[in-house]
């Protein structure tokens, strides 16, 4: 509720700054970015190599998001710093579904790992830029295992949705399963992350030309909107899996 109010208020401010009485879609888009990611830091300068790494990282997210049908849809990619992030990929769910299939979680894990996969493929090493991606991917995998019963452990709920000290053990939680089960939870979370990682790497290897092309576009334009992304994918004939 509070976030929606913030988005609406920020959109109204943006419209007023342009002397417009009506709020347009672009105002909501820009306000969502500001509320979720923080204000633009156009004066924030980074080294050329870091800028190149960020371009490939964000391109990796965008390409995986496009290729996997159940991943969140990518609407914008930018290498302009916002908040603490050096770049960002704005992705939103395609539909407001009340029921989320297992494949959507799996595809979203792969999309989140797409940036790190691009770094590894192009620069042969990874950076700290994927720390938030790893946190979110691990959270999805943990919920798949312990909350939704979407793992090889079967349809069973294993713990509450709170912060965990370890992957399979929660802080202040009354232990309802053995150390052996906790270890299996850890293994399942790691397996789901590994599956997503291998999927991201394989897809980017297959579409390496697209990765280079999009990174180059980002380095030249800094931001790619919906239409820019569609043009890249259409020009290079990139089809969804």
Which residues are covered by each model-predicted region?
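AAA+ ATPase "lid" subdomain C-terminal helix
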Residues: 1-26, 33-41, 62-74, 144-151, ...
């Amino acid at each position: 509720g509070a976030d929606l109010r913030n988005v609406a208020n920020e959109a109204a401010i943006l419209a007023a700054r342009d002397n417009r009485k009506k709020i347009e879609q672009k105002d909501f888009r820009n306000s969502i970015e500001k509320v979720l990611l923080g204000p633009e830091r156009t004066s924030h300068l980074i080294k050329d190599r870091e800028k190149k790494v960020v371009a490939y990282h964000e391109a990796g997210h965008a390409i995986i998001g496009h290729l996997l049908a159940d991943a969140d849809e990518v609407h914008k990619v930018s290498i302009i710093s916002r908040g603490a992030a050096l770049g960002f990929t704005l992705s939103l769910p395609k539909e407001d579904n009340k029921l989320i299939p297992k494949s959507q979680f799996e595809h979203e894990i792969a999309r989140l790992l797409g940036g790190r996969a691009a770094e590894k493929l192009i620069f042969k090493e990874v950076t700290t830029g994927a720390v938030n991606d790893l946190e979110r991917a691990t959270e999805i995998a943990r919920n798949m295992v312990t909350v939704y019963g979407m793992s090889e452990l079967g349809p069973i709920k294993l713990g509450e949705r709170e912060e965990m000290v370890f992957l399979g053990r929660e802080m202040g939680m009354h232990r309802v399963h053995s150390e052996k089960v906790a270890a299996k939870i850890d293994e399942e979370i790691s397996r789901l992350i590994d599956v997503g990682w291998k999927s991201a790497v394989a897809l980017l290897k297959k579409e390496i030309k697209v990765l280079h092309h999009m990174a180059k576009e980002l380095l030249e334009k800094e931001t790619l909107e919906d239409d820019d992304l569609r043009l890249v994918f259409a020009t290079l004939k990139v089809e969804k899996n």
